[in-house]
Amino acid sequence: MSSSTKNIPKPPPLPCITYQRFQSSTRKPSSLMRLVPKEALETWDKLFKEGSGADTYVETDNKSHFPAHSSVLAAASPVIATLLNQSRDKNGNTYLKIHGVPCEAVYMFIRFLYSSCYEEEEMKKFVLHLLVLSHCYSVPSLKRLCVEILDQGWINKENVIDVLQLARNCDVTRICFVCLSMVIKDFKSVSSTEGWKVMKRSNPLLEQELIEAVIESDSRKQERRRKLEEREVYLQLYEAMEALVHICREGCGTIGPRDKALKGSHTVCKFPACKGLEGALRHFLGCKSRASCSHCKRMWQLLQLHSCICDDSNSCKVSLCWNFKEKMKKLSKKEQSKWRLLVENIIRARNSLGPFSSRSSGLI
């Protein structure tokens, strides 16, 4: 056994440097070029800038043009490959016309097709033009880079509407989401910008869509706030019933069972509702007009609610628990369903706290 283990060759060392470099490079699309040797990038960039052996040219606005290599452009973009074939004249010469965007943006676009190189400041300046070009000519790597730049704080309330319309036309879901979130978050400021006013005149359907999104978001916030308020009420009821069981079973402060030693009014209780419930119980026990007293009615309701939740009314220490249990059977089905629904909501609110919440002690 020992001789066989000696013949096992040692494993090769882990490719730590290469692997870590690959991991870090996958975080941002723009850093993928780090996997390509610097010399290779410089060679392709030099080929673009010098135009040696160029067999076509790119025409921009104002009849400006610069040389390019049709094979490189065709390999980088299937759309450009088709356009070059369609532009071929009788002598076999080709050309590519890109109008409607600044010459500098076209130059950066063609340079990126060669070497994926760019100047960061120039990229930020012409990012919207390059996004359009990357979408129109189907260059996914450039499109990802533009999305990355836009998603890094480039968008503000002044340009968010313009960027949103452009992102919708270029099928950039991520940027559409970012813009929509910004509009919803600061609708008052965004709706007063010049971009909004222009969009309102040129694209009223988009304006209506954004307004509806803002209204829907406000409705969701109000609904969420309402549910949180309801949940808080249910939790307070649960805490009140916990304090009721605690007082009736163990005693607390200055009130409790006769066979239990009371802790005194200066004792700090772990049940938050105990102090308020202690005063309510004292009032309830000494009140002469329980039938008409609003405070006593709430105590009756709390006792009845406890009986709906209590699983063992026969041995329960809470006063009148068994009596309310029997009384519940005589109520109409409609009334019973109301109490049952209230109990379900309280239990659901309590369970939403989780087992480690400080608000749940588990007495009931």
Curated annotation (Swiss-Prot):
Keywords: Metal-binding, Ubl conjugation pathway, Zinc, Zinc-finger. Pathway: Protein modification; protein ubiquitination. Residues 333-355 are annotated as: CaM-binding. The gene is BT3. GO terms for biological process: protein ubiquitination; regulation of DNA-templated transcription; response to cold; response to ethylene; response to hydrogen peroxide; response to salicylic acid; response to salt stress. A zinc finger (TAZ-type) spans 232-322. The BTB/POZ domain mediates the interaction with some component of ubiquitin ligase complexes. It comes from Arabidopsis thaliana. Preferentially expressed in leaves. Interacts with CUL3A. This is BTB/POZ and TAZ domain-containing protein 3. SMART domains: BTB, ZnF_TAZ. InterPro entries: BT1/2/3/4/5, BTB/POZ_dom, SKP1/BTB/POZ_sf, TAZ_dom_sf, Znf_TAZ. It holds the Pfam family zf-TAZ. It comes from the Eukaryota. May act as a substrate-specific adapter of an E3 ubiquitin-protein ligase complex (CUL3-RBX1-BTB) which mediates the ubiquitination and subsequent proteasomal degradation of target proteins. Essential for female and male gametophyte development. Induction: Down-regulated by salicylic acid (SA), ethylene, hydrogen peroxide and cold. Up-regulated by NaCl. Residues 54-122 form the BTB domain. GO terms for molecular function: calmodulin binding; zinc ion binding.
